Amino acid sequence: MTITPQNLIALLPLLIVGLTVVVVMLSIAWRRNHFLNATLSVIGLNAALVSLWFVGQAGAMDVTPLMRVDGFAMLYTGLVLLASLATCTFAYPWLEGYNDNKDEFYLLVLIAALGGILLANANHLASLFLGIELISLPLFGLVGYAFRQKRSLEASIKYTILSAAASSFLLFGMALVYAQSGDLSFVALGKNLGDGMLNEPLLLAGFGLMIVGLGFKLSLVPFHLWTPDVYQGAPAPVSTFLATASKIAIFGVVMRLFLYAPVGDSEAIRVVLAIIAFASIIFGNLMALSQTNIKRLLGYSSISHLGYLLVALIALQTGEMSMEAVGVYLAGYLFSSLGAFGVVSLMSSPYRGPDADSLFSYRGLFWHRPILAAVMTVMMLSLAGIPMTLGFIGKFYVLAVGVQAHLWWLVGAVVVGSAIGLYYYLRVAVSLYLHAPEQPGRDAPSNWQYSAGGIVVLISALLVLVLGIWPQPLISIVRLAMPLM
């Protein structure tokens, strides 16, 4: 197949991030300079973001049989790049206090971002698997980056072993699907899988095994066991990437698979997904209730958020509104998570051993860092789905989609889960305004709002509030991505 200039323009974000990986690698080999390599990484990610405008001008196209570049791919590529950019920004002050090699951190984040972009463009089960591996493998190193801490090393080993097991399930499931359908392309799967074929035992087994593999990557119940330990053990900037970029990219490709290949038409698969969604919403929220570690709390809450998104995925067959719901919800989840994990990163920077992740560390934060406490409050309210925040718009969309598709018991689960979530999110918010302890522990630098990480956190808070009050610009962007499907 001949690659035309149009194809190259369509692949610009992927090519720019790939080039940045090579440049940073050569820079590290030539001379270790933390500031230089961080700057090169941020410039590369910003250039990839800007290049999305040129990709939009080129229009939708199938670049190779493995990749389709369209509005949908651009939306999810943009979200992954924003999450990667924020991760690098939060990592810089954290790494300033880190005594071992700093520069490889950015290299691993860039490679993981490359995997996320590949997933956003994937149109074939082969590129889906390649993208998932490309985003997972660097995370093994990132999770255990603070390897002198027992907890970080333990989290890395857990994630590596369980991720390898999940990948084997995913690969075996794909093999069974290929054996039955004779093709791995999403579009060809849609053509080959007629109504009768979807109930073939081999095909059901194949998709079942794929759900196990993808369920692990998205930390859905009952494949969630790694989530709280890994979120707690990983450095705060890495937890940011885990909670945002990896989840968004993988959920995006699952959406495309369900859109082209009518997997959701099978009643058996719909029932399994509904049970997983119900269990994830209820279990994730109930387990978060008793947490005293903010990273574990956010880990369990991410399980419930993916459960809410699964409701929209199950309703995908009922119309375009569910695609819109997922886009808006993921944007809200991205900015809220960036803000929440950003505050934890600022409190934990520079590296001085374990992160400031105990809830006690945030008690009375308002009295010495009022703006930071206000930012954290906004993020908690958004994650809880309180009106006037972007989180509310996303949750309202999910409820509307659930009602439209008559998924009544899942709508009930969303309502109950949101009520439980309200308690533990407000518990975090209230603790920020209590009397500060006499001997405060970790604290953010006094000039945090002038640092790059502080600016990212403030912008996230502003977007959560502004788009919560006036969501039309975001909804318009998400709708632009839909007709090109």
Swiss-Prot record:
Top class in the EC scheme: translocase
InterPro entries (alphabetical): NADH-Q_OxRdtase_suN/2, ND/Mrp_TM
Residues annotated as signal peptide: none
Q: What EC number(s) has UniProt assigned to this enzyme?
A: 7.1.1.-
Which GO molecular-function terms appear in the entry?
NADH dehydrogenase (ubiquinone) activity; NADH:ubiquinone reductase (non-electrogenic) activity; quinone binding
Bilayer topology annotation? Multi-pass membrane protein
Q: Where are the transmembrane segments?
A: 8-28, 35-55, 71-91, 105-125, 127-147, 159-179, 203-223, 235-255, 271-291, 297-317, 326-346, 373-393, 408-430, 455-475
A Gene Ontology annotation in the biological process aspect, one of them, is:
ATP synthesis coupled electron transport
User: Where found, per UniProt?
Assistant: Cell inner membrane
The record lists the catalysed reaction(s) as: a quinone + NADH + 5 H(+)(in) = a quinol + NAD(+) + 4 H(+)(out)
Keyword set for this entry? Cell inner membrane, Cell membrane, Membrane, NAD, Quinone, Translocase, Transmembrane, Transmembrane helix, Transport, Ubiquinone
Q: What is its main location?
A: membrane
GO CC, one annotated term? plasma membrane
Annotated function: NDH-1 shuttles electrons from NADH, via FMN and iron-sulfur (Fe-S) centers, to quinones in the respiratory chain. The immediate electron acceptor for the enzyme in this species is believed to be ubiquinone. Couples the redox reaction to proton translocation (for every two electrons transferred, four hydrogen ions are translocated across the cytoplasmic membrane), and thus conserves the redox energy in a proton gradient.
Q: What's the subunit arrangement here?
A: NDH-1 is composed of 13 different subunits. Subunits NuoA, H, J, K, L, M, N constitute the membrane sector of the complex.
Instruction: Give the UniProt family note.
Output: Belongs to the complex I subunit 2 family.
Instruction: Tell me what this protein is called.
Output: NADH-quinone oxidoreductase subunit N
Q: Which organism is it from?
A: Escherichia coli O7:K1 (strain IAI39 / ExPEC)
